[in-house]
Amino acid sequence: IVTSLGVLTAVATLLSGGVTTAYANDALANPNSAMGYPSFKGAADPIPGTGVAFDPSTSYLKQVFDADVANGAGTDTAHDFWIDKMLTRTGTAPNGTGTNDAGDYNYAGADKNEYLFSRGRAAFMYTHTPEALGFVGDVAYWDQTGNDGFTVEVSIGGSKQTLRENTDKRKQTPSYFTTEFTNGDKTITVTEVKYITYTNVMVANFTITSTTGGDVTLTAASPFAQDGNDGDTELTGRFNVKNDLTTIYPRFSGNGFTVKDGKLASTLTLEANVPQTTKLQLGLIANELPDSTAEYEARFNGDLTDPAASYKDSVTTYNQWWVDNIPYVETQEHNIDKTVFYRWWLSRFNMLDANMPGNTFQYPTSIEGVLGYNNQIVLTSGMFINDTKWFRNAEYSYGTWVSAGQTAKKGQSGYYYYHDNPGDPANWNHSYTQYITKAGWDSYKVHGGPSSLAEALGDYGSEDVKGLLNSQSEPDSNDNQNSNGNKLIDWSWWSMTGNDADAVSFSEPGRSGQRMDRADGSANMWANANAAAQAYKAAGDTEKAAEMQQIADAIKQDVLDNLWDSDSKLLLHKWLNDGQFAKYKDLNNYYPYADRQ
């Protein structure tokens, strides 16, 4: 947990490989086991049974997956894969009300199970309106488009039906979403199952039942695809995504649907109480992702036209990814285990793998909050790398630090320092505190690779550290991080720490806007410099390794010489204008103790 927060330098072990120095303050330590477990609420056992005995000699997740397939997983929404079952949400929970150890609570920001978990490599729902048929809300292709995916109307005898969602039928797993609708007199029931395939095809299956029988017409429209002649079997379009990072070529079709007036229409003849199933698919096709065409065409006129086959292919592919990529984790507390799997899902959900042209998102890249800031923000990149380095496919962790290195900003000094991805300069276009090189080096120690890759990591880290140490005249004052020319990072704004208003050390009365040498940013910079030295050493570049180690040692010495307060026996931030230590302490004062290298 500590290394996820920040990083870096253990003052107590900084100087001599574990030997306590004069800078350290002896203190009592309590074992973590003394803390006990928190009080958990919810399901009595949050981990569903697998029916599979654990065998450490083989892949447990593969055994569970195979058992799921044998038991019909993927054939319908009543037969789920194990991780889908574990992370299922039903109804409109969480609704923001409940009781915990502190009493009753009411949280107005609860999501009510409305966000769509299913996503593709680049496509997802930034906002989602589940009470409407289709993909209604703000579709994102890497970021918001401002458009619905597609809408669907149901008509009987030319009369549009008003459908109401039965929210108690709402069910969501990471791989699909399903719910049920009825019309006013309850003569029509529509069960919807929707999902986004790996390569960005948005599919909705509709099972329609009529208590009376007769013709039911479905009319579907998509702002992405409106070109086509009446009688055609698909609509097409062209769309430049946000900031013109790429162009997609949407294709829209459905089983038995034909074009009429720029929309798709299909009339089903139903027998009373005999359900019929059909489907619609919107492919967000990108030239740089040729599989997006293949996945769409398989559902348009290929071997996945059948709704059940399309669904099974998508959810099976989704769940196979877990087997291929994540390690199995089990503790003595199943509530913790579920949190671990949920965290794996978060790492996956917040991954953009768009293979875009240009120098923005050409690599798989972890994104800070695809439903929020939605950019590769350097502040959190290290945290994501620390998690994704455990994925078996190295591209997920390597992609993030390679992307940061390739999109680094050239400073006035001529060095390139890590900077928020230029694909979305609105969020936030700064160089916040970060430990990307350190996290990248940790990922390299897990996965390895050619010496050229280690050399590249060393180069990225070297440029970043030198760029920050020489940042005195950047156009954006927030990117000036060493105003006094020493070996310490200085800031005047709490957001640079990532803790925002929780970085209370900035809040001394009369000190607003003043700069201080920081223990946290300097510790992170030391970690990056030290990691760059280690990467160069692994690459066999001893000259550059020695140079970066010298810089790392100089940073360490400046931290100890300038930020150690012998009275409080703690590293404190220090104001530049008068050399006084900051009066207020915060979590960030402890960053230098957080990692023992």
Predicted regions and their residues:
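Sec-dependent N-terminal signal peptides
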Residues: 1-11
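Sec-dependent signal peptide cleavage junction
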Residues: 14-26
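Terminal accessory carbohydrate-recognition/targeting modules of carbohydrate-active enzymes
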Residues: 23-334
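Amphipathic, well-ordered alpha-helical segments in soluble domains
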Residues: 137, 142-150, 175-177, 400, ...
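Beta-rich accessory regions
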Residues: 202, 209-220, 535, 547-550, ...
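The feature captures the catalytic groove of carbohydrate-active enzymes
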Residues: 273, 277, 281-304, 369-370, ...
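Substrate-binding groove/exosite segments of carbohydrate-active enzymes
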Residues: 311-455, 459-463, 572-597
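Active-site acid/base region of carbohydrate-active enzymes
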Residues: 334-356, 388-391, 395, 409-413, ...
